[in-house]
Every structure is written in structure tokens, then in C-alpha cells.
Amino acid sequence: MNDEVERRDGPMAAPVVMPEGMAIRYDMPDPRLAVFVTGYTAYSAESREPQIDWFLPAPVMLGVALDAGPIHPRIGSRTFPPMVQASLIGPTSRPFSVTTHGGTMVGIGISAAGWAAMTGRSAVDYHNRIVPLDTVLDPSVVDRLITALTAAPDRAALRPVLDEILLPLFVRQDPHESEIRALMSLVVRPGMSEVGELAAELGITASTLRRLSQRYFGMPSKLLLRRARFLRSFVQLFVSGNPTDVTAIDPSYHDMPHFLRDANTFLGTTPRRFMQLANPFLTASVRARAAVLGAPTQALHAPPVNRD
């Protein structure tokens, strides 16, 4: 099955071919949501046989299961109860895996600015956690979301449904809005790897940066920078298929052992072993996301320069 995606220039923006009975789709949100929502995705599998899928560490994701069997999630080595129909997957610094039994999972990526506009809660409380979505959002909104997505005739109809429901949600005004948006851009900037440099760019102290990072990004600023640096490097290895290509890793890594220590933190294993675990959804999503949304993984998503 070949899921068509809007092509963008770049080595990762390649045609996405899925095995028979599986499909993947990415969509950009309404431009008014662009700073809050990093993108929409839908993964579908017809078979009801158990399937294990692995995904890279990422910012907050809202997930809604449609016509799905039991979904058993794990973050790193921690297992969670079966996911309810609508869940919030908090910001992660460990790999996320799920054992599914067919159906569709609709994902809504939430940026740090989106988190600040959606809720007054601290994102660090959800670090490496999965909770029912109605414990964070108004249950009536969650019910409406589930009902509308269930009624959508096909995957192409998901975007307008999501836009309509999500637009009214991001209304909270946060006093740190400008710092959050600046931090979103700086974290994913190639070459940015030091907390001191990041704080200086923002014009704030390292302690203030740490508090902002924990509250809105869900983890300390040092860990946030390490995650972005590691994923920039790992994605290059993943796409090339060569897990030992030292020329692909970020130059701020002292050597390959330094990179492998980060791999153990963010993948729980070596790049080679994780790549052997890669399933069709992860392999396709790296290219499909780059083609449609401009970045191969949510944690490297650059925010829009201007807000309409």
C-alpha cells in the first residue's frame, strides 16, 4: 500500500510504501494551530493479530483509538495498564512501544506552546507517563473528540474534524509565552547543545531556564537538549541504515562511546539493536513526517516563525 504524502525537498522525503493492510497518514493542522499543534497522524492496521510498534522519544501526544483492540503501552522499561480510548502520552525521554491488535490510532502532537495554552498544569508531572485524556481536558471535549473522529468517513476527513475541535482549546494566556516559543526554536537548532549558551540566547539564568523547561517541555533543559542532539544524529543513522557511521553524529559528541551513552538513555539499547526492532510504522513515519511536516520526528519539529 502506497500512502501518498505531500513531498518536500530533502533525503527523507521519499515515497511511503506500507505493507498490505497497513496505512499511515500525516496532516498539517490549520495555520492558526501551527504553533500549538505539531501535526496530525493516523496509523491503521487491518489485522487483529498482536503487533509491537516502537517509537522515538517525543513531546506530548494525544492519542485516540478507533475500532481498535486492546493497546498495551510501555515507556522504556515501565509497563502501563491498557490505554483507554483517548489518552495523553506525556513528554518522553525513553522509547515508547505499544502492542496493538488492529484498528486506527489518531495522534495529535502538542508543542510546549500548545501545552501552555491548553492547561495550567506542569508538563514535568507527565514526563514518561500515560494518563486518560479526560484527566487533563474537560471530559465533554474528550467525548466530542471521540464521537467526531469515530464518525469520520475516512482518514482524509480527520484533519477538518480535529481543526474544528482543537481551535477553541488553546486559549490560555501564559506570562512566559515569548520565552516558550523562543525556547522551542532554539532547542531544535543544530549545534545548540549547551545549557549556558541556551540561557544566554534567551537572556535568562540557567535556573530560570530549567524551571521553564520542566514546566512546559516536561524535563530539565539539559535533558531536553540531549534528546534533540541525539535524535538529530540517530535519525540520520536510521535513514541511512548504517548504525556505526560516525560522520552522521552531531560534532558535539566527543566520540562514538559518548553517543552510545545517549543511545542507552533515549533508546534503552544500542542504535543497531533498536534499528533491528524497527517496525513498518516507525520506518515509514520518519519519511512521511519529514515529507509532510518538515521534520522526521516530533521532537525535532521547528515552530513557525510567525503566528497569524
Feature roles, as predicted:
Residues 1-181, 186-206, 219-220, 235-238, ...:
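Alpha-helical bundle regulatory/interaction domains
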Residues 210, 214, 218-229, 260, ...:
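Basic, alpha-helical helix-turn-helix
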